[in-house]
């Protein structure tokens, strides 16, 4: 049986990061980069208790998140959980019947730690940050 996982961040797709930040209460950005693998600009914002928000701005029509922005005009996109081992991720994939569709791949926003993306039965995108 699996236990509760620690949520690392919630990801939001936005049309324009600068415009989004200008209209929000966010004051401190932890990290801002362009990720060539995702073809997107990414911003990591630290909240309390090591909880983060990620803003994702697709930069081309072949970005992973471009269709999401086009179809939904942005908004909540995914939840990222921290995992501590390959055994742990395999347990979650099997027990929750998750379908992995991307990764593991290095994530420049997280100092090239590996990330994997899955979808669950609720059609929610789940990201796993491999913290080992």
Task: Give the role of each language-model region.
Residues 36, 60-62, 85-86, 108:
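Short beta->alpha connector loops
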Residues 1-3, 6-15, 33-34, 41-48, 52-57, 66-88, 92, ...:
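Vicinal oxygen chelate
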Residues 1-38:
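Long, hydrophobic N-terminal alpha-helical segment
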Residues 16-18, 51, 61, 85-87, ...:
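Residues that cap or initiate secondary-structure elements
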Residues 56-64, 76:
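Short, conserved turn/kink motifs that form compact alpha/beta structural patches or helix kinks used as
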Residues 62-65, 102-104:
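Short acidic (Asp/Glu) patches
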């Amino acid at each position: 049986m699996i236990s509760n996982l620690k949520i690392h961040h919630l990801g939001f797709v936005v049309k324009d990061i600068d415009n989004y930040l200008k209209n929000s209460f966010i004051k401190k950005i932890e990290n801002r980069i362009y990720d060539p693998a995702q073809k997107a600009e990414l911003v990591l914002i630290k909240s309390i208790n090591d909880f983060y928000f990620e803003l994702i701005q697709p930069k081309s029509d072949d970005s992973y998140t471009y269709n999401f922005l086009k179809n939904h005009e942005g908004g909540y996109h995914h939840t990222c959980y921290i995992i501590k081992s390959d055994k742990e991720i395999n347990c979650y994939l099997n027990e929750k019947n998750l379908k992995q569709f991307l990764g593991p791949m290095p994530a420049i926003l997280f100092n090239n730690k590996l990330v994997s993306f899955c979808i669950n039965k609720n059609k929610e995108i789940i990201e796993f940050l491999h913290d080992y």
